[in-house]
Amino acid sequence: IAYASALAFDLLGEEVEKVRVFLSPNIIKNVKSVVVPHTGGERGIVAASAIGICGGEAEKQLNVLSSVTQEDIERSRELRRRVDFQVERSVRDYIFSIIIEMEGKNNSSRVELAGNHTNVIEKRRNGEVVFSKPYEEKSDTHSTDRSLLTIHNIVEFAESVDIEKVRETVERQIEYNTEIAE
């Protein structure tokens, strides 16, 4: 969301007056209460979009927020107070869909991502397409082979694994899940 918002803001080229965020249902579910990286605990969809606008560096893609400053965080809080943010379900039926629309005083922009966090499939400025590429959701996007995830196999793995080989991964997951739960 932050990446798409940073792209849309760059495309807009002026102060933001309105933001519409369209997301596929699973993204809404997963992001609505998650901590936004590099924000000191800011949470949710609107926070992710606002910090992308105020401190995001779109050219860094997944690291879009890696250089966020405290000043950027304060500006994003002010932006959320001042600007109308609307969050809606995406018009696309994709498993992964993010569409950001922005309006300024004189311009508008729209950025669409599909399939994954960095797959930009369309950019528009003032209604005109400035970038477009075809996207077709593959049927295997909808399912992952989980046939090995039986209770028996999970218990067997847990009882036999060398904990030192998985400690870092498990501790990281505990940290992430704790942040989400808080």
Question: Positions of the model-derived regions?
Answer:
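Glycine-rich, flexible loop motifs
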Residues: 60-84, 164, 178
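Alpha-helical support elements that line or immediately flank enzyme active sites
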Residues: 1-14
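Charged/polar positions on well-ordered alpha helices
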Residues: 7-10, 51, 179
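Residue-level recognition of the N-termini of beta-strands and the immediately preceding loop/turn
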Residues: 16-19, 96-98
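Signature of multi-pass transmembrane helix bundles
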Residues: 80-182
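A structural-propensity feature for long, helix-poor, extended segments
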Residues: 18-58, 77-83
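Conserved active-site and cofactor/substrate-binding residues in soluble primary-metabolism enzymes
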Residues: 1-3, 40-44, 48, 67-74, ...
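C-terminal domain-closing interface element
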Residues: 42-62, 91-109
